[in-house]
């Protein structure tokens, strides 16, 4: 990465994961926490596809390198956070990118998270075994 190249930033969140995504003009390599993207995501095709989805929606998958710093949660949450962060960075790149990314759902925050445990129950909704007598 040269010192005068333009860098586009985006932050994504999913479950308890937070991803800070940088887009740099390049050849399409994905680096997550200093490791190659497919290696970091355990070569799981669903996770890799989720990370690449915003770039492929706009046809820019070979024009920008994706540099990611992500923490918290597991691979599902992290790949979702990276997807949202990359989409936000692409919106920063050009305002015209917003509409196709929004229609594909890459910009919306997934609100699903682990439900808290309630007192009197074993888990969030699992009650102790009922005994009639």
Curated annotation (Swiss-Prot):
The entry's keywords: Ribonucleoprotein, Ribosomal protein
Key word Ribonucleoprotein present: yes
GO biological process, one term: translation
InterPro entries registered for this protein in UniProt: Ribosomal_Su5_D2-typ_SF, Ribosomal_uS9, Ribosomal_uS9_bac/plastid, Ribosomal_uS9_CS, Ribsml_uS5_D2-typ_fold_subgr
Gene Ontology cellular component annotations, sorted alphabetically: cytosolic small ribosomal subunit
Biased composition annotated in UniProt, kind: Basic residues: 114-133
Region described as Disordered: 98-133
A Gene Ontology molecular function term of the record: structural constituent of ribosome
Regions of compositional bias (Basic and acidic residues) in chain numbering: 98-113
Family assignment from sequence similarity: Belongs to the universal ribosomal protein uS9 family.
Protein's name in the database: Small ribosomal subunit protein uS9
Organism: Synechococcus sp. (strain CC9902)
């Amino acid at each position: 990465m040269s010192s005068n190249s333009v860098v586009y930033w985006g932050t994504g969140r999913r479950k308890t994961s937070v991803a800070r995504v940088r887009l740099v003009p390049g050849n399409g390599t994905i680096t997550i926490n200093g490791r190659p993207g497919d290696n970091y995501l355990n070569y799981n095709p669903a996770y890799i596809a989720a990370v690449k989805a915003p770039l492929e929606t706009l046809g820019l998958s070979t024009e920008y390198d994706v540099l990611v710093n992500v923490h918290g949660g597991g691979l599902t949450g992290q790949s979702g956070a990276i997807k949202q962060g990359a989409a936000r960075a692409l919106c920063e790149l050009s305002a015209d990118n917003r509409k196709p990314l929004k229609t594909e759902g890459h910009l919306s925050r997934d609100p699903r998270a682990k439900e808290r445990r309630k007192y009197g129950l074993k888990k969030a909704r699992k009650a102790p075994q009922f005994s009639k007598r």
